[in-house]
A protein has these predicted regions:
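Beta-strand-turn-beta hairpins that frame and shape the catalytic cleft
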Residues: 3-14, 106-116, 185-188, 257-263
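Core catalytic region of metal-dependent phosphoesterases/phosphodiesterases
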Residues: 16, 21-111, 209-211, 216, ...
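Binuclear metal-dependent phosphoesterase catalytic core
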Residues: 109-110, 230-238, 250-275
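Catalytic metal-binding/acid-base residues of hydrolase active sites
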Residues: 19-20, 47-48, 81-84, 120-121, ...
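A general structural motif
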Residues: 9-10, 36-39, 72, 111, ...
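Residue-level marker for buried hydrophobic side chains located in beta-strands
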Residues: 13-15, 42-43, 189, 246
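Proline-aspartate-enriched helix->loop->beta-strand connector
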Residues: 38, 185-195, 233-247
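Active-site-proximal loop/helix segment associated with metal-binding centers of metalloenzymes
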Residues: 112-226
């Protein structure tokens, strides 16, 4: 079932690229550099949850809360590959002014409804200490890390780590059915990666270097994009009036209008207002 987040007081919505744990800088940019007020900022993954103990994030929230309250702003975090999925259940991080939402959540604002779907394959996973034991045991086949519908996964540890098995995106048919039958329209989509027709700016030489140690990486990355393609196809099938699709992950900027949808890749800390 899709979780709905309503922000009826919001007068604008912006989407931000990867922040990689720079929570204080994000709020400073929002409230001081950009002077945002009455704004919902959605972070398109790689937020940085999971690299520290849980109480660390509570401390950060309490530190930035006064600025968010004074400016009447909110932060919505979407899951990236450099995030512990356990934080993105809609409950673990659920402050009044910031929240880490589960996949296929719908952010409802006077500016439109935004569908949030996280996840991606870490291209640098072989260099992550938490990944290497699985690799050497021969368990790095991408299918093991994909979340099939109806799959009841074991609880993900909240202990600090640098990589998590359930990092990839998944297509949730039941969530899309829920949105469709509820009569909710989607005007914008925020994901961590884009559909296959979108730019990914991954240098071939870099991929070749990574594949030497991680041979299943290209296939896993391809499946990620195919998952986004399936999401796009379902949105079109249900006739959602999608105008914007924004994503991060690649640490570069790019944008293009394709078949009536404005696709935007955001670099780290780059913010774009939805209009």
């Amino acid at each position: 079932m899709t979780r709905i987040y309503e922000f009826q007081e919001a007068k604008s919505v912006a989407v931000c690229g990867d922040i990689h744990g720079k929570f204080d800088e994000l709020v400073y940019r929002m409230t001081t550099l950009c002077g945002m007020t009455d704004t919902v900022v959605i972070v398109a993954g790689d937020c940085g949850f999971g690299f520290h103990k849980r109480d660390y994030y509570d401390q950060v929230y309490n530190r930035v809360l006064p600025k968010l309250e004074k400016s009447n702003c909110w932060v919505v975090f979407v899951r990236g590959n450099h995030d512990n999925p356990a934080y993105f259940d809609g409950e673990t991080v659920s402050g009044k002014r910031w929240m880490a939402v589960d996949d296929y959540s719908l952010v409802v604002t006077p500016c439109g409804n935004i569908l949030c779907v996280g996840g991606a394959t870490s291209v640098d996973r072989y260099n992550r200490e938490s990944y290497r034991p699985l690799f050497h045991l021969g368990k790095n086949e991408g299918v093991l890390y994909r979340k099939p519908i109806g799959y009841i996964e074991e609880p993900v540890s909240m202990d600090p780590a640098d990589w998590w098995p359930m990092e990839t995106p998944y297509f949730d048919e039941s969530a899309m059915e829920s949105i469709h039958h509820a009569g909710r329209s989607v005007q914008a989509v925020v994901t961590h990666i884009g559909p296959s027709m979108c730019e990914d700016v991954m240098p071939p030489t870099w991929i070749d270097y990574l594949v030497e140690n991680d041979p299943t990486l290209p296939a896993d990355m391809r499946r990620d994009r195919e998952t986004m393609d399936a999401l796009l196809a379902r949105l079109r099938r249900d006739c959602h009036p999608v105008r914007h699709w924004l994503y991060g992950h690649y640490h570069h900027s790019w944008q293009s209008d394709i078949n009536g949808i404005g696709y935007t890749m955001l670099r780290e800390m780059e913010m774009k207002e939805l209009r």
